[in-house]
């Protein structure tokens, strides 16, 4: 039996509220629960991953810092950054013949961004030793996942049209001097719009993971 996939359009929402909702969803889901993708933007916030080191926050600012349970180091979220959280029952995918590891899920997320950027004529790439997506050495997309009971939550953050200045207050993802990029550096302001980019991003991701598109349902909240 093919499972439904629910796409939730959450708009702009507080990071901690969304994070706790992801935890609750994952803790309470059953083997019958549909997988979900949450599309959201967060007001300004720095988030530290589980292995996050304090020294990667270079200076104190008015922006709050939240200690998260995702993988990875510190990053920044702000308006104009498209976040895609993937709440997927990985162990169930394996029983359906889609033998996917956590590393393969990370690769699927990276490839969905690479394919999305290619739709705009932008060449990008992933790095085996530093998860994310890059353009000419600059990072345009950050990744961080948590796996609990064989199910994923957290996901990716793709810079679309945002203020990149707060990244200068951190070593992004733990890399000193790492420069950041965004879609608005390469396309018109009209094209660099989260509402236009997110459908392409989702389309590529669900295609890579092999979801039946007749079983995909969009919900705007």
Swiss-Prot record:
SUPFAM superfamilies for this protein: Class II aaRS and biotin synthetases
Superkingdom assignment: Bacteria
Keywords from the named record: Acyltransferase, Cytoplasm, Transferase
Enzyme nomenclature, EC number: 2.3.1.181
Enzyme class: transferase
Chain coiled-coil ranges: none
One GO BP annotation of this record: protein modification process
BPL/LPL catalytic domain location: 31-213
Location of the protein in the cell: Cytoplasm
Pathway this chain belongs to: Protein modification; protein lipoylation via endogenous pathway; protein N(6)-(lipoyl)lysine from octanoyl-[acyl-carrier-protein]: step 1/2
Pfam families for the chain: LplA-B_cat (PF21948)
Main location group: cytoplasm
Residues the record marks as site: Lowers pKa of active site Cys: 139
Role this protein plays: Catalyzes the transfer of endogenously produced octanoic acid from octanoyl-acyl-carrier-protein onto the lipoyl domains of lipoate-dependent enzymes. Lipoyl-ACP can also act as a substrate although octanoyl-ACP is likely to be the physiological substrate.
Annotated HAMAP family: LipB (MF_00013)
Other comments on record: In the reaction, the free carboxyl group of octanoic acid is attached via an amide linkage to the epsilon-amino group of a specific lysine residue of lipoyl domains of lipoate-dependent enzymes.
Full protein name: Octanoyltransferase
Species name: Mannheimia succiniciproducens (strain KCTC 0769BP / MBEL55E)
Gene encoding the protein: lipB
